[in-house]
Amino acid sequence: MRVTDFSFELPESLIAHYPQPERSRCRLLSLEGPTGALTHGTFTDLLDKLNPGDLLVFNNTRVIPARLFGRKASGGKIEVLVERMLDDKRILAHIRASKAPKPGTELLLGDDESIHATMTARHGALFEVEFNDPRPVLDILNAIGHMPLPPYIDRPDEDADRELYQTVYSEKPGAVAAPTAGLHFDEPLLAALREKGIEMAFVTLHVGAGTFQPVRVDTIEDHIMHSEYAEVPQEVVDAVLAAKARGNRVIAVGTTSVRSLESAAQAAKNDLIEPLFGDTQIFIYPGYQYKVIDALITNFHLPESTLIMLVSAFAGYQHTMNAYKTAVEQKYRFFSYGDAMFITYNPQAISERP
């Protein structure tokens, strides 16, 4: 399959630069996987689409202020984007500079350049940086970091983004991008879902900056997926198996929840799904056999991205591309701060190719 098979025309005006004033008031395009039928509504329609006993699986990662500005002690300006926190003193990061720093390079970080750090090693495209500061890394990032808004949100980050670019249930710091399908859930909607008898479980996948990297090969089978840390604890496994046993659906909130659950299913030795604590490089594209997910809540993704490929593998290629064409025609808002989709599984998708 070619990357260009997953391209579509998107007017610049449909890229959302700010979220809706009320999280759950975004539009919702529902796609019935088996038939391709589309219906238009608002996000709170989920209450009518979910049945008592259905299981929603959320990603409880929390976005860290992962973008740092500063300069090398020798003078050149740099921009640092944290990929992951290694421990209380060290990070793994992308560094943008006119000339890549060498190991041993001193860095002065923060708007006032008050934080001293050293680039200690290079690992491929990533740089290992150690802070010369008594505070833990997370405290330093909270003090001097900027929220790492995606590159297509073409504006500087604002103070409000520290909350707007977080899910209301975010708990475990470590992501450099929000699991954006979850941004639409507010406390009243969560309460109403619980009231209806909808079950909830939480995985953790710390979204890395690699999520924004374009696919740089022509043939998607040649693409090497970036690595991200995921946790699928025993209580999530129990909730999934219980939902399946009683004939209810497992509904992933976002592609990161999909990738966490499917990674845990792939690694399982004795059951449908087993606990997972570790890195995943799972790449889901048409032809993939889904093992766990029955329905998916997700935002609208970039053309030619691994995420639109994941959706195509779930709903079927033709149904997905038709839904995106309709979304553009109906002026849905796209990407991280945009509108959402509710998609049910298409069992025929596995045999469909572009």
From Swiss-Prot:
GO terms for cellular component: cytoplasm. Its EC number is 2.4.99.17. It is found in: Cytoplasm. Keywords: Cytoplasm, Queuosine biosynthesis, S-adenosyl-L-methionine, Transferase. It catalyses: 7-aminomethyl-7-carbaguanosine(34) in tRNA + S-adenosyl-L-methionine = epoxyqueuosine(34) in tRNA + adenine + L-methionine + 2 H(+). GO terms for molecular function: S-adenosylmethionine:tRNA ribosyltransferase-isomerase activity. SUPFAM superfamilies: QueA-like. Signal peptide: none annotated. It holds the Pfam family Queuosine_synth. The keyword rRNA-binding does not apply. GO terms for biological process: queuosine biosynthetic process; tRNA wobble guanine modification. Gene3D superfamilies: QueA-like. InterPro entries: QueA, QueA_dom1, QueA_dom2, QueA_sf. Pathway: tRNA modification; tRNA-queuosine biosynthesis. Monomer. Belongs to the QueA family. Transfers and isomerizes the ribose moiety from AdoMet to the 7-aminomethyl group of 7-deazaguanine (preQ1-tRNA) to give epoxyqueuosine (oQ-tRNA). This is S-adenosylmethionine:tRNA ribosyltransferase-isomerase. The gene is queA.
